[in-house]
UniProtKB/Swiss-Prot annotation:
Database matches in CDD domains: CYP105-like
UniProt-annotated binding residues for heme: H118, R122, R311, H367, C369
Listed name of the protein: 20-oxo-5-O-mycaminosyltylactone 23-monooxygenase
Classification via SUPFAM superfamilies: Cytochrome P450 (SSF48264)
Enzyme Commission number(s) from the entry: 1.14.15.34
Top EC category: oxidoreductase
Any Pfam family matching the protein: p450
Pathway annotation: Antibiotic biosynthesis; tylosin biosynthesis
Family designation: Belongs to the cytochrome P450 family.
Keyword field contains tRNA processing: no
Length: 420
């Protein structure tokens, strides 16, 4: 992908980074877009987002394959459209942000079904991610975090916070939740990372298929014996009873495993990095852990590591003077919506005392992230323990020297070297 320095002005605002921009695009009021849009700062959305939100919050754009799409960047528009029943998530209708998109048309995951099928399927998983179940899981997460920090401090006074803490923590939690062998972590971590890199193309598709095959073998093993105590076993048991199909179990196992460790690991790492850049907030949270729940929501808003939700219109939609036609693709810029001045005062500032719960980091509407309660709890436990156990934590490299994961659907850094 070209860098943000390649952006050129158009007649209606700016061009997002892309390999292609021509007079026809500009005359038509379109901008070309390459995905994911490059971030040049780990703490800010792509620099073009603010201008888009201010000047053209519902904007026409052109994707890598020439397909037209609408970019939605203001929060009121994001919420209205994501909750609109005329907006679909069916993969066959979605805009393709990269060559690896659009290959899951037969999938039956929570992120590929529209109502009413989506609601019926989601109902099978809600108890596993409700507040009661998350409270029950908290002691187990605390045990994992304590063990990892014990190992970390016993080995010395330096570490890579991502590789040595955040990723093992998130992986152990999802392995316990699903009842997946932790010793297989290298295999599924590598494939998940590859599958979430849009630019990887065929390699991303191959990694996704290998991840599916791996989980299919685990599911088949549980089908012929005791299904076990984890969520995967519970899904298999429901399939035995006719409540779920094999495709339901497999497709959602892939979703839960992939989303359940990489995103959380990146969010923990990036959250620590943000707090290290704001020593006053770090000290306040060390003294008053009761501020952590609010700080977690502010971190989710401020970082917005998952961006670019895809949808399509199933009927004509009139919104704020624009007509979105049936069949049009939509891309929701969540990172832009989470910096909306109409919703958050001084949105570019990081403020653990603000009420940030109105963020859309988990999406919005019927497909809002099912695991958000678990994610919040993991962040609270992990950050609280780091603040308590490693109060003198510091990065051992300049932020400018960190390698950013700008080629991934889940933004983050490749490593975070720290000392204490």
């Amino acid at each position: 992908m070209s860098s943000s320095g390649d952006a050129r002005p158009s007649q209606k605002g700016i061009l997002l980074p892309a390999a292609r921009a021509n007079d026809t695009d500009e005359a038509a009021g379109r901008r070309s877009i390459a995905w994911p849009v490059a971030r040049t700062c780990p703490f800010s959305p792509p620099e073009q987002y603010a201008a888009l939100r201010a000047e053209e919050p519902i904007a026409r754009a052109e994707l890598w394959d020439g397909a037209p799409v609408w970019l939605i960047s203001r929060q009121d528009h994001v919420r209205a459209l994501l909750a609109d029943p005329r907006v679909s998530i069916h993969p066959a209708k979605l805009p393709r942000l990269s060559p690896s998109d659009g290959e899951a048309e037969a999938s039956r995951s929570l992120l590929t079904l529209d109502p009413p099928d989506h609601g019926a399927l989601r109902g099978h998983f809600i108890p596993e991610f409700g507040l009661r179940r998350v409270r029950e899981l908290r002691p187990s997460v605390e045990q994992i975090v304590t063990g990892l920090l014990d190992d970390l401090t016993a080995r010395g006074d330096e570490a890579d916070l991502l590789a040595d803490f955040a990723l093992p923590m998130a992986t152990q939690v999802i392995c316990r939740l699903l009842d997946i062998p932790y010793e297989d972590r290298d295999y599924f971590q590598e494939r998940t990372e590859q599958a979430t890199r849009p630019a990887a193309g065929e390699e991303a598709l191959e990694a996704l298929l290998e991840l599916r095959d791996y989980l299919d073998r685990l599911i088949s093993g549980k089908t012929g014996r005791e299904s076990g105590d984890g969520m995967l076993g519970s899904m298999v048991a429901q399939a035995r009873g006719g409540g779920l199909s094999h495709a339901d179990v497999l497709d959602n196992a892939v979703l839960l495993l992939a989303a359940g460790h990489e995103t959380t690991a990146s969010m923990v790492t990036m959250s620590v990095l943000v707090l290290l850049q704001h020593p006053t907030a770090w000290r306040e949270l060390t003294v008053n852990p009761g501020l952590l729940p609010g700080a977690v929501d502010e971190l989710l808003r401020y970082l917005s590591i998952a961006d670019g939700l895809r949808r399509s219109a199933t009927a004509d939609i009139e919104i704020d003077g624009h007509t979105i036609r049936a069949g049009d693709g939509l891309v929701f810029l969540l990172a832009a919506a989470n910096r909306d001045e109409a919703v958050f005062s001084e949105p570019e500032a990081f403020d653990i005392h603000r009420s940030a719960r109105r963020h859309v980091a988990f999406g919005y509407g019927p497909h809002q992230c099912l695991g958000q309660n678990l994610a919040r709890m993991e962040l609270e436990v992990a950050l609280g323990a780091v603040l308590e156990r490693l109060p003198a934590l510091r990065p051992t490299t300049d932020v400018a020297g960190l390698r950013l994961k700008s080629d991934s659907a889940v933004f983050g850094v490749y490593e975070l070297p720290v000392a204490w």
